[in-house]
Every structure is written in structure tokens, then in C-alpha cells.
Amino acid sequence: ADGYMESHPNVTIEMTDLGSTDYMTQLATQLAGGNGELDVLSIKDIPGYSNLINLGMLEPLSGKLTTDESKFNGVLKQLTAEDGNYYAVPFRSDFWVVYYNKDIFDQAGVEYPTNDMTMADFDAKIREVNEKAGVYGNIYHTWRSTTTLFGILDGQHTVIDGNYDFLKPYYEQVLSEQADGVIPNYGEQKTSGLHYSGAFENGQAAMCNMGSWFISTLQKYNAEAASNGVQPVNFGIVKYPHPDGAPAGSTLGTVTSLAVNANSEKKEAALDFVNWCASEDGAKCVAAVGTFPAVASDETNKIISSTDGFPSDDASLEALNTTAIYLEMPLSDKAS
């Protein structure tokens, strides 16, 4: 908002804090009865977004966006309702990558993972580094996302399909890795509370498939390592593993979007702000605070990669380039 007001001195944006607890429910309550007090709305999850569409509280934005829709890597299509309109535009994106501990790979004489790994390649890398380094090859956190959502990366399936046969090969791969002891046991992770961050930071696991938010966690961990009496993690990132036939850079993610109140008296001004947030200027402002913009570019990637503690290798910079982002939960009236 500050960046927009700097370039639009005639506009004042006042923020309203609805709190983080049950935010989308609070937002729906605020908009009830045709309340037009709020102009621009932050959309934080798909179920809440679906509810607001059904209640008629959001202005259709299809055809009103000034940024090329293709730059959103397919996300706008996934936000499109049954009536053919999308009612929100992403400005922030968190997508998944693979983190790896360079020191573990170096000491074991294992080549680093690459930016173009099939699921079979990922499995082989997990097994190789486990055998040669004596640590877990990867840690899959206990969320469903870490295993189930490999299945949506071919662009042909979603988790609301109703038929889940397509998930079988991915579960078989991970269960085989678990049976062979090259990854932590799921049950033991649940009972012990072993967290992916701790396992990766202390060298129990050579790799970790996780969202881009973990980058800032590791940057903070390394910045405070000396004062906390721990060793920093020499980490890198590469693109997410993909099924055969899917292009490298296919990944899963979540977005935070902006919408316009259908009852706003300042729709034109609100739409201009939404368009600015989706523009290159808006994306640079998002990147400047260490957050990944929904519309990335070489310029925003350079901003992100120039932050203190970001891996300096070319592969990590290239890992920021995605070709398709599949939402962890697609738009559906069944989403919850």
C-alpha cells in the first residue's frame, strides 16, 4: 500500500485489521448486508473465497486485469468460478521447492539435486545420499501436502476428483522409502513431534520438500546461529520433483489474493490498486520485503536472491522460476 501511495499521492489507503483468527469468517460478517465500507479485500484461503463468491460479495474481475493473465502460471484459471469469472487476483505466492544441505552432499561425494528431477530421480537421490551419508535422504513433513500433492503436478488431477487412484504411485514410492529406512517413519514423526525444520537444520535429513516460506526461516536461523551456539546450514534449493511428462518447474502452492467489494462506492479506485499490486511495480514492492510475488520476473527474483543468506549458487536462483503452480486446494464449494 505504501508503494502505491508514493506513486499515487492523491490516494490514501486506510488499513482495517480483522485479526488472523477466523479471518475469512470475520470478513464475511463485515460485508454482510451490503456493507460497502471496505473497498479492497484480502483473500487468504479458497473455502472463504468460494463462500464470498456464493454470497455475491465480490466484484467480478475477469477482463479488468491489466497484467497478462498468462504470467500467473495458471493460477487465475484455478480461481475461476463456474460462471466463468474470477473474483480475486493473486499478489503473493508461496510455492514448493526442494531444500538440500550442501555440506552433507559434499562430504558424501554425492552430486547435488538438479532443477529437473522426475519422481524417480528424486527417489534415487534420496536413496543415494542416505546410503553414502548415513542420514535420512529426505524428510516429508506430516502434512498431506508433502506426499499427496505430487499427484496434481501433471495438471490432470485435483484432490477433489472423487477418484484417488492417481495417488497410488506416489504413496507407493514414499512408503517404499519409509520401509527401507531412507526417510523418517511417519508414525514416529507424529508421536515424537519431529518437525521438518529441526530435522533439516540439525542435519538429520539431507533434503526437505517444502514451501518457499522455509527460505526466510533458514535465513533467520543462519543469521542467529552464532549467538544461539549452533552451526549454520549451508543450503541450496532446486525446483520441485515432477511426474514424467510434466515440465520442470511444475509445483504446488498457495496464494494470497486481492478482491474488490461488490458494494464498494470506490470500485474504480479499488480496481486500480488491485491492478497495481499485480503489476511489475507492485511485484517489486512485494519482493522487497522478502515475500514472493504472484507475478515473478527476473527482476523480482534478483531482489529475493539478494537478501542476506539466500544461497549464492545459480541453481538456487533458477529454482525461483516456475512454469506452473497448482493450488493445494482448488476452488470448489466442497472445499473446507
What are these regions (language model features)?
Residues T21-Q26, I152-N234, V238-P243, E268:
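Extracytoplasmic ligand-binding clamshell segments of periplasmic binding protein
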